[in-house]
C-alpha cells in the first residue's frame, strides 16, 4: 500500500509548499522510491484553464491534456516524472462531480452535504492516484493557508484519511514561517505556534514542521517550536532561503527531512543518490559566460505567467555553462517605442504564448527585429503564430495578413481555426490539449537538435498555420521543419538563413527538466551565446552567481 504525505501551509500564502513537496519527492526518488504528487486547490474554478495569467500565473499542461496549477510543473521537473489530470484537483471539480452524482441519483435521495459527500469525493481522488500509478508515496499539497475558509473541506478530508489508511501510512507536514523582526533583533516563533494551534483545532497534529526563514534557525528557537508545537526536535526542519529553488532538495536532505519521513512511515531507510543533482547545482553556480535574453510577452508584470519558460531557459543555461539575465519586455511598449530600444543589446529573443489581440503587433515587431538583425529567436505557440504573421507581411508581401483569431474578416488569414474547433462553444478544456506526435523534416536545424524523426510535445491552442499559404511560404524561404504525422498541421517552422530562428506551435517548456534540458532551449541558448556573450570575471566567478532559474 502507498504511504500518504500531506503538506499544508501556515502564516502566509506563497510560503513554498510546492517546492517543499517537490523537493521531498526528489529526495525519495533518489532513494529508488516511486512518487506521485497531487495538488488540491481550494478555488471554485473547475481548472485554471480560463483564469487570467495575472491572477493565477502559468497554466501547466500535462501529457493527457489537463490544464493545471503551475506547481505541477515543479513536481515534474524535480521528480522527472510526468503527472496527469489525476494529480490536479480543485474545489470546483469536486463540487461538479458531487452535483453530477446527485443529478444521476447516486445518493438515492439523501441530503448532499460537505461531510460526508464532499470529503469522501476528496479522499476518493487521493486514493485514485495511488490506485492508478501504484507509487510508494503519494504526496498531497493542500493549496491556501490553514485558517482559510476555502480549505476547510480539504483539511477535514485529510484529517479523516489517517483513520482510513492507517496511522503508519499517513504523515502530516506543515510548512510555516519564522520571521526575523529587525527591531527586536530575533526570529519569532509565535506565528508558527498559532498556525499549529489552528491546525490542531481542526484535528490535525503535524508530524513534521518545515520552518521557512531567511537565516539559520537558532537551536533555542528550534527547541521552543518543538516544545510549544508538540513536535520532536529532530522533526523541526529548517528551510532557509536559497538563491535557486534547485538548492532546496540538498538543504532539506542535510536537515534530515527524508530520513525523518521514512522513519515515521516505517519505511526502509536507504542511501540517497544525489550526485547528479549536486553536480547540477555546482555547475549552476560556476558559469563561464554571461548574456542577456529578452522575453517579449503580454503578461510580463507577473513573471510566473511564463514560469516554465524561465525554468527551461535556466536548464539550458546550466548545460551551456551560461549565466543569463532575463529582460522582461512588454510587447505593447515595443508598439509605442520600437523594438531597438529594448532589444538592441540582447543575445537572444523569446516570444512566448498568450491569447488575444493585445500586444500582438509588438510581438510581430520584435520578431522582425530578430530576423533582420540575426538575433537568435525562439517562438512558442502565439510566438510561432506571430512569426507567421511577420513573415507574411514583410517577406511574402501580404500586408493585410493576420490571424483569424484577431481579425475574423482578414483577407489573408495565415493563422486559422483548427477544423475540429469550429463548432466549439465552451472555453474550458476544449482546446487542442496534451501530448501529440510531430514528424521532423530531415536536414533542418530542428531535426539536428532533436536527433530523431518523431517527437512528442504538449499543445494548448485552437489556431494553426493556414495550409492555403504553405506553398507561398516555402517559395519565399520559410521552412516547415515539423508537422503532424499526416502532414496536415504545421507544428514547427524555421528560417535557415539565420543563426537560430525556430518557432513551435507546441509548448516545449513543459518537457524540459533540470538534468535534461529541452533540445530547442539548449540550441537557442547555445546560439545566443555565440551571438553575444561576455566572459565572467574571476571576481564574479568567486561569488554565488544567480542564474535565471532563481528568478522563480
UniProtKB/Swiss-Prot annotation:
Positions annotated to bind ATP:
14-19, 71
Does the keyword field hold tRNA-binding? Answer: no
Q: Which sites bind CTP?
A: 13, 148-150, 188-193, 224
- Chain segments carrying region Disordered: 533-552
Q: What is its EC number?
A: 6.3.4.2
| Residues the record lists as binding UTP | 13, 188-193, 224
Spans traversing the lipid bilayer = none
CDD domains reported in the protein's UniProt record: CTPS_N, GATase1_CTP_Synthase
Activity modulation notes: Allosterically activated by GTP, when glutamine is the substrate; GTP has no effect on the reaction when ammonia is the substrate. The allosteric effector GTP functions by stabilizing the protein conformation that binds the tetrahedral intermediate(s) formed during glutamine hydrolysis. Inhibited by the product CTP, via allosteric rather than competitive inhibition.
Q: Which GO terms describe its molecular function?
A: ATP binding; CTP synthase activity; glutaminase activity; identical protein binding; metal ion binding
Q: State the UniProt keywords alphabetically.
A: ATP-binding, Glutamine amidotransferase, Ligase, Magnesium, Metal-binding, Nucleotide-binding, Pyrimidine biosynthesis
Q: Is Glycosyltransferase tagged as a keyword?
A: no
The region called Amidoligase domain is annotated at 1-267
| Pathway(s) per entry | Pyrimidine metabolism; CTP biosynthesis via de novo pathway; CTP from UDP: step 2/2
Q: Which reaction does it catalyse?
A: UTP + L-glutamine + ATP + H2O = CTP + L-glutamate + ADP + phosphate + 2 H(+); L-glutamine + H2O = L-glutamate + NH4(+); UTP + NH4(+) + ATP = CTP + ADP + phosphate + 2 H(+)
Stored PROSITE patterns: GATASE_TYPE_1
Query: Superkingdom, according to UniProt?
Result: Bacteria
Q: Where does Mg(2+) bind?
A: 71, 141
Its cellular-component GO annotations read: cytosol
Q: Which residues form the Glutamine amidotransferase type-1 domain?
A: 292-534
Q: What does this protein do?
A: Catalyzes the ATP-dependent amination of UTP to CTP with either L-glutamine or ammonia as the source of nitrogen. Regulates intracellular CTP levels through interactions with the four ribonucleotide triphosphates.
Q: How does it assemble?
A: Homotetramer.
Other remarks? CTPSs have evolved a hybrid strategy for distinguishing between UTP and CTP. The overlapping regions of the product feedback inhibitory and substrate sites recognize a common feature in both compounds, the triphosphate moiety. To differentiate isosteric substrate and product pyrimidine rings, an additional pocket far from the expected kinase/ligase catalytic site, specifically recognizes the cytosine and ribose portions of the product inhibitor.
- What is the recorded name of this protein? CTP synthase
Amino acid at each position: 500500500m502507498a504511504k500518504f504525505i500531506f503538506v499544508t501551509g501556515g502564516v502566509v500564502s506563497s510560503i513554498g509548499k510546492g517546492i517543499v513537496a517537490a523537493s521531498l519527492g526528489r529526495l525519495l526518488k533518489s532513494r529508488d522510491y516511486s512518487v506521485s504528487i497531487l495538488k488540491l486547490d481550494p478555488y471554485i474554478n473547475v481548472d485554471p484553464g480560463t483564469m487570467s495569467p495575472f491572477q493565477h500565473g502559468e497554466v501547466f499542461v500535462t501529457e493527457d491534456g489537463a490544464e493545471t496549477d503551475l506547481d505541477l510543473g515543479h513536481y515534474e521537473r524535480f521528480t522527472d516524472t510526468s503527472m496527469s489530470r489525476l494529480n490536479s484537483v480543485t474545489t470546483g471539480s469536486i463540487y461538479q462531480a458531487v452535483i453530477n452524482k446527485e443529478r444521476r441519483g447516486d445518493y438515492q435521495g439523501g441530503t448532499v452535504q460537505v461531510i460526508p459527500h464532499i470529503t469522501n469525493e476528496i479522499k476518493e481522488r487521493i486514493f485514485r492516484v495511488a490506485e492508478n500509478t501504484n507509487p510508494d508515496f503519494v504526496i498531497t499539497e493542500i493549496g491556501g493557508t490553514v485558517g482559510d475558509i476555502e480549505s476547510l473541506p480539504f483539511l477535514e478530508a485529510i484529517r479523516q484519511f489517517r483513520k482510513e489508511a492507517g496511522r503508519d501510512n499517513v504523515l502530516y507536514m506543515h510548512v510555516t514561517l519564522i520571521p526575523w523582526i529587525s527591531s527586536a533583533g530575533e526570529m519569532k516563533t509565535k506565528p508558527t505556534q498559532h498556525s499549529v494551534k489552528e491546525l490542531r483545532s481542526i484535528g490535525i497534529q503535524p508530524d513534521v514542521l518545515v520552518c521557512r526563514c531567511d537565516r539559520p534557525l537558532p537551536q533555542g528557537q528550534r527547541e521552543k517550536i518543538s516544545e510549544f508545537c508538540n513536535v520532536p526536535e529532530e522533526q523541526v526542519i529548517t528551510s532557509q532561503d536559497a538563491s535557486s529553488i534547485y538548492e532546496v532538495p540538498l538543504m532539506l536532505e542535510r536537515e534530515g527531512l527524508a530520513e525523518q519521513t521514512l522513519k515515521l512511515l516505517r519505511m526502509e531507510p536507504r542511501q540517497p543518490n544525489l550526485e547528479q543533482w549536486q553536480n547540477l547545482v555546482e555547475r549552476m553556480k560556476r558559469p563561464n559566460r554571461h548574456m542577456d535574453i529578452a522575453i517579449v510577452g503580454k503578461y510580463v508584470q507577473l513573471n510566473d505567467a511564463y514560469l516554465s519558460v524561465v525554468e527551461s531557459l535556466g536548464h539550458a543555461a546550466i548545460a551551456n555553462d551560461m549565466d543569463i539575465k532575463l529582460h522582461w519586455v512588454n510587447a505593447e511598449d515595443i508598439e509605442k517605442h520600437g523594438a531597438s530600444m529594448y532589444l538592441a543589446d540582447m543575445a537572444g529573443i523569446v516570444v512566448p504564448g498568450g491569447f488575444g489581440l493585445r500586444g500582438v503587433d509588438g510581438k510581430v515587431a520584435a520578431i522582425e527585429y530578430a530576423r533582420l538583425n540575426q538575433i537568435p529567436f525562439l517562438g512558442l505557440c502565439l510566438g510561432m503564430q506571430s512569426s507567421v504573421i511577420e513573415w507574411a507581411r514583410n517577406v511574402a508581401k501580404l500586408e493585410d495578413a493576420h490571424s483569424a483569431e484577431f481579425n475574423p474578416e482578414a483577407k489573408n488569414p495565415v493563422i486559422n481555426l483548427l477544423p475540429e474547433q469550429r463548432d466549439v462553444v465552451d472555453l474550458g478544456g476544449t482546446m487542442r490539449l496534451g501530448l501529440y506526435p510531430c514528424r521532423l523534416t530531415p536536414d533542418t536545424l530542428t531535426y539536428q537538435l532533436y536527433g530523431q524523426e518523431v517527437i512528442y510535445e504538449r499543445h494548448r491552442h485552437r489556431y494553426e498555420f493556414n495550409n492555403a499559404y504553405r506553398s507561398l511560404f516555402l517559395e519565399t524561404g520559410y521552412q516547415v521543419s515539423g508537422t503532424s504525422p499526416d502532414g496536415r498541421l504545421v507544428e514547427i517552422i524555421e528560417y535557415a538563413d539565420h543563426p537560430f530562428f525556430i518557432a513551435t506551435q507546441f509548448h516545449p517548456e513543459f518537457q524540459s527538466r533540470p538534468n535534461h534540458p529541452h533540445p530547442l532551449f539548449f540550441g537557442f541558448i547555445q546560439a545566443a551565446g555565440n551571438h553575444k556573450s561576455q566572459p565572467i570575471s574571476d571576481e564574479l566567478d568567486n561569488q554565488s552567481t544567480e542564474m535565471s532559474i532563481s528568478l522563480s
